[in-house]
Amino acid sequence: GLDRRIALAVLSRVGARTSHVVIGSIVVATLLAFIVPSATARAAAIIPIMMGIIVAFGAEKKSRFAALLMITTVQAVSVWNVGIKTAAAQNMVAIGFLQKQLGHDVSWLDWFIAAAPFSLALSIGLYFIMMWMLPPESKDVPGGHEAVEKSLEAMGPMTGGEKRLLAVSLTLLAVWSTEGVLHRFDSSTTTVIAIALLLLPG
């Protein structure tokens, strides 16, 4: 529920211009990369939302706009696998290999400083390339913004579970980003602790 709420909240602010909706999809993929440590899980969360957006905007499933939105979203998910250490399992495997072979660790912040600029550049390039390859049929989608607003309103206020997940996610992000600066806990350990907290009853 929280991932859908974040996606709709972002898309509700981008308006009805198709170019802004595409930018919104990239922003959603970027934000979720910070709190969902799996590209597969992020794609599984975002794709149904984007399918709903396409339907809400009244676009044909075989339209260029639909293809543009879906392909851009999935590629944005992959792009941010590079920029954020905890965004993909293969990053953690690579770091484990470096630790074992070279005795060198890479903190979350060090990874982000080194790799995030590449993901940002790729995201910008992705937008322009996709808009060039699959130009949408129209510049505006009448009623699209209202449809997103209605979907967001239908979700109602945040539930206790969503608030708890958001609090744990933001805390975990803060702990990840201060790894090696304020504490010595590695990303894997703090992730396991966060999962344990989410599994607690109540």
Regions found by a protein language model. Name each.
Residues 29-33, 80, 118-126, 130, ...:
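Alpha-helical transmembrane segments of multipass membrane proteins
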Residues 9, 13, 30, 52-56, ...:
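Generic, well-ordered alpha-helical scaffold segments in large soluble proteins
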Residues 128-135, 158-163, 172-202:
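Flexible hinge motifs at transmembrane-helix junctions and intramembrane kinks/re-entrant loops
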Residues 1-60:
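Membrane-embedded alpha-helical segments and adjacent helix-loop junctions characteristic
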Residues 12, 16, 64-67, 155-162, ...:
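Membrane-water interface of alpha-helical transmembrane segments
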Residues 2-5, 39-42, 57-156, 182:
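Juxtamembrane and boundary regions of transmembrane helices in multi-pass small-molecule transporters
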Residues 19-27, 70-71, 112-116, 166-170, ...:
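Hydrophobic alpha-helical transmembrane segments
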Residues 42-46, 118-119, 186-195:
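Structural signature of hydrophobic alpha-helical transmembrane segments
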